[in-house]
Amino acid sequence: MTPSPEAQTLPKAQAVEYLRDHQVAVEVGFSLPTFLQVEVPASLSRTKVERSLRIGAYSYTGAGTEMRSARIGRFCSIARRVIFGQAEHPTGYVSTHTIAFNPTAGFASDEYFAALATKRPVPYAGDVVLGHDVWIGDSVIIRAGVSIGSGAIVGAGAVVTRDVLPYEIIAGVPAKRIRMRFPDELAARLLQTGWWDHDVRSLKDSFDRPEAFVDAFERERASLPKLVFATITMEQVDRGTFTVRTYEAAAPG
């Protein structure tokens, strides 16, 4: 794919409309992050995004979800009120309050706060990373830096503080393994297919039979076209302006 010749700089409101006009479901007034990369189609309806987001085709988020620095694969199902990678406070300083590390927060105009507050480093835990075909239940909290493998399921209300294996089902506070979705051999074969990267319309009748699906995929792999989607990137130029680029892609035949 190559950058579209229509790359342009747009005010925020027009950039949001551009997404809406190109199969990305967002509400009017959507808060664009500093950097956005989205394969179309995708849905971010009533979702708050900060810093950066990369999201794959057919992934969607529920109302009230908040994301901060996330990378999400294709075909991910994210329910309502999910919290991704919120900022953390240092625990080794005298105080966990912003007065110990962020002089621009909240009370910056207060004389005492301004005199005492000092900018100090807060280690960055990293992006939240979801593979492909991940299902996140309602009201889940995912700590910054956590990676969740393809095919995993996170139960509603869980607090995820560790990495999650592909096809692992976890739940609870803190989240712990409930079971694996499939036996190890089948999970490994299913992961190896990378079906989310291929046009598998010819295999749709076996979607409810994972072993039959994998057998058919392995037989037909060479004839299954790769899926390539149009991709939109938006990068903030200043407070109210974004550079928009569209990478075009032909639909599979």
Residue ranges and their predicted role:
Residues 163:
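Short, solvent-exposed beta-strand-to-loop segments that form ligand-recognition rims
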Residues 21-146:
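Flexible, glycine/small-residue-enriched loop-and-beta-strand segment within the central core
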Residues 135, 149-159:
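A generic "structured core" feature
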Residues 138, 156, 166:
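Catalytic-loop Lys-Pro-X-Asn motif of eukaryotic-like protein kinases
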